[in-house]
Swiss-Prot record:
InterPro entries, A to Z: PsdUridine_synth_cat_dom_sf (IPR020103), PsdUridine_synth_N (IPR002501), tRNA_psdUridine_synth_TruB (IPR014780), TruB_C (IPR032819)
GO biological process, one term: tRNA pseudouridine synthesis
GO molecular function: RNA binding; tRNA pseudouridine(55) synthase activity
Name of the protein described by the UniProt record: tRNA pseudouridine synthase B
Biological role stated in the UniProt entry: Responsible for synthesis of pseudouridine from uracil-55 in the psi GC loop of transfer RNAs.
EC category: isomerase
Entry EC number(s): 5.4.99.25
Protein family: Belongs to the pseudouridine synthase TruB family. Type 1 subfamily.
Amino acid sequence: MYNGILPVYKERGLTSHDVVFKLRKILKTKKIGHTGTLDPEVSGVLPVCIGTATRVSDYVMDMGKSYNATITLGESTTTEDQTGEVIDKIDVQANAININEVDAVLKQFEGIIEQVPPMYSSVKVNGKKLYEYARKGETVERPIRKVNIDSIARTSELQFEDGKCHFNIEVKCGKGTYIRTLATDIGKQLGYPAHMSLLTRINSGGFDIKDSITLDQISQLHEQDTLQPHLFPLEYGLKSLPKIYVSDENIKTRILNGQKFNKKQFNQTIEQQLVFIDSETEKVMAIYIQHPEKNHEIKPKKVFN
């Protein structure tokens, strides 16, 4: 039985659910879950939690992500990416815009920004996913969402061809960001219809694409009984949370029994969440949170026995 976080390289053409389904067959276990959907036409790293590590998938999902994307100016599509039907078109003449204009616009999108999710997305409105409305030709009012763009930078020259302009960007962002929507919004600021024509996720939850492995490689490693070294311990998925290392056996027992604690008992500033680590084994024992009614107390959220 495997336990840990496996950075899978998702190839284009597969859904995130496909990856989980195939892994369950390869590893012969149902206790597998991914940490953030990647669209079928997007490739890149998809951290997958296996066994007890499924309990920390939310924390991996909440960590930042990085993407390499290609933006195409001159055409917008129904899906905001290269798979949709063209709905608006304006020829971009050679050298109609320059890198200074592009860089200035990109800078405007750093920080907390507002996005309207695309109709072809899994965001729910009135209990239904937006793509369900879109497939029926229906349009509904979509919620404006705030997302965080840590950084965005152009990584290529501008390429003009066939009335379009292409350029690459690298984006570091928070959970819930739609790069497709970012591409179309950048185009609007530059005065052109636009879409995202290529996307690769290069980092997710601290897992880099260079450390990811394909489903074929996973299958081979599993058959050779050499897959375990490629799994990261579940503690890795909690690295963004503050930690308290515990050596006192009595306190360890209380933690593993899910008891509450007075915050003054620990010589450390405690925010909303923290992780208790066994100082001897360096294994996580529990995740504790601020008590909702008693400011001086913390209570268990998840205990790992």
